[in-house]
Amino acid sequence: GISLSTNQINYCKEKAKKLGLENQVKFELIDYRLVKGNYDRIVSVGFGEHLGVKFYNTFFKKINSILNENGNFLFHLIGVVDKPSAPNQFINKYIFPGGVCPSLSQLIKPIEKTGLIVADTETLIRHYDKTLEAWLERFLAKRNEIKDLFDEKFCKMWEFYLASCAAAFRYRDLVVFQLQ
């Protein structure tokens, strides 16, 4: 796996070691544009929202250049089912600056432009609201401990973020896309 987050890389390495998998997996702190080699399988989960639409051409071109001829690429991200629109102002300001939840039309064109073939598209419209509700429950159960690490303002923002996203998924304003 690759990431620009030292915390993510360290967490993954520790988890792999606990599971006895440290010799079977590799985690690297690197920008995706610098990845070398050829791969049979590439999976991207939760990165497309942070990448931003303006960098999709670069990203998919890179994927195409390192994916073997008969390889498989899975792109999993949160999106919108409506027409392309501006990012949510609250989330863009306080949670994920520069982030965007794209429409399917914003994804397909740059994928096809790079020569990748969209073989399967799935829109997951059930259950993610329940995931966010579970995260909110866990957050609320540990709220005092989290407040000690951050502050009350952060706790209120995070609580609002999780609750509003759960509602957005429940009412189909947000969905999860999986493209292969």
Listing of model-derived features with the role each one plays in the protein:
Residues 57-72:
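A short glycine-rich, Lys/Arg-flanked "PGG" loop and its adjoining helix->strand segment in the class I
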Residues 21, 51-52, 67-69:
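Helix-to-beta-strand junctions that scaffold the AdoMet/dcAdoMet cofactor pocket
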Residues 44-49:
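Residues lining the SAM
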Residues 1-34:
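Class I SAM-dependent methyltransferase SAM/SAH-binding core
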Residues 56-59, 75-77, 83-84:
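Serine-hydrolase catalytic core recognition
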Residues 78-178:
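Substrate-binding/catalytic lobe of Class I Rossmann-like enzymes that use SAM or dcSAM, i.e.
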Residues 34, 50-51:
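A short His-aromatic
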Residues 30-43, 173:
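A short acidic, Gly/Pro-enriched loop at the edge of an enzyme's catalytic core
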